[in-house]
Regions:
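Intrinsically disordered, low-complexity terminal regions
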Residues: 1-96, 104, 152, 170-183, ...
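Generic recognition of cysteine residues
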Residues: 5, 140, 155-156, 207, ...
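Alpha-helical solenoid scaffolds in large eukaryotic transport, assembly, and signaling factors
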Residues: 45-166, 211-213, 246-258, 264-271, ...
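Alpha-solenoid helical-repeat scaffold
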Residues: 54, 61, 65-75, 81-87, ...
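Extended HEAT/HEAT-like alpha-solenoid repeat tracts in very large eukaryotic scaffold/adaptor proteins
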Residues: 85, 122-132, 148, 173-206, ...
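Acidic, Ser/Thr- and Gly/Pro-rich intrinsically disordered linkers and low-complexity segments
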Residues: 113-123, 131, 156-195, 233, ...
Length: 351
């Protein structure tokens, strides 16, 4: 009897179709680890009851895939073994077999971000894992983008990232152990700024690659960031993350329309923070970010650019009337004549 070959789908976008050629869920359920040491993420992702973690799509993992996921998730959280963590990140970026684990990795990242807001190393690891997942050329991520954005946006706009002044991780720096906080209450630990900046860069990358296939993606991100920036009850760290994201995602047009018209009102927030020793450093970071935003806006003018304002000191009142006295003083101090001209020529009533 001659041998023949028949083609069938093992998986479609990471989901195993229910056809006779593929094993059924009931046949594969016995492969899942059981007992108190079983991985809850795998159990939830495969449809077992009594677990709160819900996958994006339920399908069966082979025993090898289960073991791979367990090793990856363990390595990502092991901040004491950098070599192992780097190996996991390399696997996520380059291994074609990761596609089968995409749903579980995204769920894992989202859950860890949600429950580890006070743990900077975990947040950093989750952002790195997201970055490597985006860089894997063998994975079709378009359907997953709406689920990947929220944890990254949380790292960008989160109210408090890192330990509080009354709490420090076992491997915390001496600065944190001496009572420094990460979000502007007490002396400042700046690690959370790097987390927010990395998250903003990831959102920029996501928008560049996937905004065409995910309608309204850029608009939703920008709306969330603008709302956070205009909420003056939010901490300065949130304002910083919002500014970084708006600058990277919307570019010069977003700065001109969303940020520039609100700087005069924001001047009061800056004045109050600069007068507070515990928040002064954070306020200076935000001022520096605002200047970068204005530089980007000015550079985008292209051929419209001129020599700038000749007498900056003489234009201080006009500048302050548009962007507030703190930003105006920084523009004059840094001799940003072209930026001053771009601001003075901007029609804020049309923004």
């Amino acid at each position: 009897m001659p041998l023949t070959c028949v083609a069938h789908w093992l998986a479609v976008e990471g989901v195993q179709p229910s056809i006779p050629q593929n094993p059924t869920a009931s046949n594969q359920a016995d492969l899942l680890p059981k007992g108190p040491n079983a991985n809850p993420h795998l159990a939830a992702a495969n449809g077992l009851d009594n677990y709160s973690v819900k996958p994006l799509v339920k399908h069966v993992l082979s025993k090898e895939s289960q073991e791979l996921f367990a090793k990856l998730s363990s390595a990502l959280l092991d901040e004491n073994n950098q070599e192992w963590q780097n190996a996991a990140l390399t696997s996520i970026q380059s291994d074609p077999g990761i596609h089968q684990l995409t749903t579980y990795l995204i769920t894992f990242i989202a859950e860890k971000v949600t429950h580890s807001m006070k743990n900077i190393p975990v947040l950093r690891a989750m952002l790195l894992a997201t970055d490597r997942l985006l860089a894997n050329p063998t994975i079709y991520l378009d359907p997953y983008i709406p689920y990947m954005v929220p944890p990254v946006l949380t790292c960008c706009l989160g109210k408090h990232l890192g330990p509080t002044s009354h709490q420090a991780p076992s491997n915390a720096s001496s600065e944190t152990l001496n009572g420094n906080n990460v979000n502007g209450h007490g002396r400042t630990n700046t690690e959370h700024f790097e987390i927010r900046k990395t998250a903003a860069s990831l959102l920029q990358q996501i928008c560049r690659k996937y905004s065409a296939s995910n309608q309204g993606l850029k608009t939703r991100i920008a709306r969330s960031c603008l709302k956070a920036f205009l909420d003056y009850n939010k901490p300065l760290g949130t304002h910083y993350g919002a500014l970084e994201t708006l600058r990277r995602v919307l570019g010069a047009d977003g700065i001109r329309i969303g940020i520039l018209p609100n700087l005069k009102i924001y001047d009061e927030v800056l004045k109050e923070a600069l007068a507070d020793d515990s928040r002064k450093e954070e306020a200076r970071r935000i001022l520096a970010t605002i200047l970068v935003c204005l530089d980007d806006m000015e550079r985008s003018r292209g051929a419209v650019r001129a020599n700038g304002v000749a007498n900056l000191e003489g234009q201080r009142d006009r500048l302050a009337d548009k962007v507030g006295s703190e930003v105006a003083d920084q523009i004059i101090k840094s001799d940003r004549t072209a930026v001053a001209q771009a601001i003075l020529e901007a029609d804020l009533s049309m923004a």
